[in-house]
Amino acid sequence: MKNNYTSLKSSMDEGDELKTGHEFDLEKGILPEYNSEEEGALPPYSDISKLANPVPEDSSTGPTETTNPNVERRQEFKDSHPNIYSLLRLLISVLAVIVVFFTAWVCVNPLEKSIFGKVAFSVTIGITCPIVFIAIFCFFETWTQAVAQCIKVTVIFLAQCVKVTVISLAKCVKVIAVGLYNSKKDLVVTIWLAWVVICFILFGCVKDGRLNLNKALICSTSSISAALFFILLLVCIPIWTLKHMLFGLFQVLGVQSCVVIVTKGLMYLLDKHIDATGYEIEASSLFVIGNFLFFYEMERPGALKRMPKFIGNGIASFLGGIANAIRGIANAIGGIANAFRGANDNNDIPLGEMDVESEV
């Protein structure tokens, strides 16, 4: 008979065996006996021992020191090129002594006539220069590291200062721009009133004869307009819409130029020379047109682009209205004619027919 052997261990028992560590690692070998009576002893290969002793086994050499890469490069250069390194130290030391000597020559030499000047110059040349030479040549590495660290700290400090200054200026400009943009209506009215006052002053100077008429026309159409446009550019709209603003400015100046050309052409065609009154009318009309076009462009961007189409539609609507009016007048005249024609037809009925109709 075959003995059918079945294990009475359940899956939970097998899991407990794994947890208790009855299985041994093939690489580490069989676990040694564990004496629980020893104080502070922990079972080997356990996770608790790893946590209790986090220092690796090969850490007996001590902690490694972090070295500066600049110091390493300098040491490598010194070891590989000792002659060049010594020559460089000597050259820098001599240059420092030369700088000290010329500084003493410039500052102390004018006082050489006095005893104090002679003593100061002698001390500077005889004591200070050798001390500077010895200090720089013998302690070259120390003071170069100190100077490099000082330069590094200074550069970082200056960079931080520049960064903070730029950020502060940007915030100030943003606050000012937002404030001006939010209060644009009041400022626009103020600038517009100032423009009106300036133009009236110019017109008054023209009237009194203290200003040439051509200059008044140029000032009223070019200088004042350009100044106002650029001031309103900074007040009414953000600075980044400069392209749109300049385009509107050139469009307004173009319209003003067209008005000037048309006005002068009509006056010359009618054999009327432009006198003082003509110049005043022209300048005033340009002033009004410039104001209207500019404020209309500011309230509705792109209005100047749509203006030719708008004018064409207006002219077409006006001509259409005139055509409709003429058509209405023609229809009215036709109705009146039909009425007169009907009256004439009634008058042409014979008298005999009228008597017959009355008898019936």
Curated annotation (Swiss-Prot):
Q: Which cysteines are joined by disulfide bonds?
A: none
Q: Is Membrane given among the entry's keywords?
A: yes
User: Is Cytoplasm one of the keywords UniProt gives this record?
Assistant: no
Q: Which residues cross the membrane?
A: 90-110, 120-140, 150-170, 186-206, 222-242, 246-266, 276-296, 310-330
Q: Which UniProt keywords apply?
A: Membrane, Transmembrane, Transmembrane helix, Vacuole
* One GO BP: meiotic drive
Described by its record, this protein's role is as follows: Acts as a suppressor component of the dual wtf meiotic drive system, and can suppress but not confer meiotic drive by compatible poisons. Wtf meiotic drive systems promote unequal transmission of alleles from the parental zygote to progeny spores by encoding a poison and an antidote from the same locus; the poison is trans-acting and forms toxic aggregates in all spores within an ascus, wherease the antidote is spore-specific and targets aggregates for degradation by the vacuole.
State the name under which the record lists this protein. Meiotic drive suppressor wtf13
